[in-house]
Amino acid sequence: MNSDYEIAKEKDISELFDLQLRAFESEAEMIGSRNVPALMESFEENCADFKNWTVLIKRDESGRIIGAVRYREDGDHIEIGRVMVAPEHRNRGEAMGLMTAVEELTQAKVFELYTCTKSYININLYEKLGYRTYKEERGDRDLSFAYMRKTID
């Protein structure tokens, strides 16, 4: 794995939660709804869910977390969740780097994620990385989600 990335530890949860709120605030603005799951989650829920995921992080020169992606493995299948980059570090390839690092780290064959159908910037990024939408569903908070998959031969 690229030395720019590391696996988050429990001591990082508070900083990750702060990053999550800052990163997904712009998502809420873009889609016109605050019903974004990452913004609806409490700190306590976030802490409890941490153990269910592996979280890959990137820090800046000062040691502050500037990007993260969580994932979980099931055989050769990876579920990706909560790709997030600090607003002041966007458009520098950080999200793409995190996603690529997960692929390299896991050596899995199938990667899946979901995002709001109005998240055009995210969908564009995922498509550049080789993800394709395989279904769309309306969520329980009046949002529709695109489920995307990438398969590596």
Indicate residue ranges for each PLM-predicted region:
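A short beta-loop-alpha structural element at the N-terminal edge
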Residues: D4-D18
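Conserved GNAT-fold acetyl-CoA-binding loop/helix
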Residues: D18-N46
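A short helix-loop-beta-strand connector motif used in the catalytic cores of GNAT acetyltransferases and
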Residues: E45-I57, E79
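Conserved beta-hairpin
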Residues: W53-V69
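Conserved beta-strand in the GNAT
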Residues: R64-R72, H77-M84
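Conserved acetyl-CoA-binding loop-helix of GNAT-fold acetyltransferases
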Residues: R82-V85, N91-E104, N124-K128
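Conserved beta-strand-loop-alpha-helix junction that forms the acyl-donor binding cleft
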Residues: R90, L113-I123, G139-L143
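Conserved GNAT acetyl-CoA-binding A-motif
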Residues: M99, L105-T117
